[in-house]
Amino acid sequence: MVSPDAVRTVLGICGNVISFFLFLSPLPTFIKICKKKSVEQYSPMPYLATLMNCLVWTLYGMPMVHPNSLLVITINGIGIVIEVVYIILFLVYCNGKKERVKVVMVVLAEVVFVACLTLLVLTLAHTYTLRSTIVGSVCLVFNIMMYASPLTVMKLVIKTKSVEYMPFTLSFVSLANGIIWTAYACINFDPFIVIPNSLGTLSALVQLVLYATFYKSTQIQIAERKAQIHLSEVVVKGGSLSNKTTNDGDATSPVSETMAPPHKK
């Protein structure tokens, strides 16, 4: 018979693998952004929230906070690098200085917060249990924020009736990630993991429901937009051809005058 600890270990490894693919899931979105050289209506909030989540979980996994948590440090350290790359690409292709300043200020605030939290925990909390509880509680809050961050995107989907700016891959991998980590934490109950990942599972389910609901209307909108672009090109080309024909006619047509015959008495 397989022991619960063995199952939990396997789920933990699977969770790390899925988390890695979760970090990579926005890659098609950023490839699209790079090709168009514009972030269009994509929001930076999911990536900023994920960066914050990775920062606090990396702190949680440190030996002086929660010993024997190498997997936690590894996967969240990788997550930090990936999210920083995404945010840099967003800064490069976002529209307007105001948006760039806003994103930079949020990143700076996150770094300052984690630095202050690290200093306070290491100086005021003198046991692993207390440090783990404090940092774990903070992780719980920011994990919930990470899963709640797509709410802004979901609002846009409902408003525009288009899922064009809500990547399916990200929603699907988020669902798988939430299910795996919820199951992992239920074997040896850990509220710091169960609560945020249960909410993450629910959030991902809602996103997939919205995707199924508005997928057809999205395709219609995309088709109409392409048709309008094609029509505009035809009109522009037709207008250019007409002007060319008119100009050619003016240049080659002789100017004739009708002279009245002399009047005879």
What do the predicted segments below correspond to?
Residues 1-265:
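Alpha-helical membrane-protein topology signature
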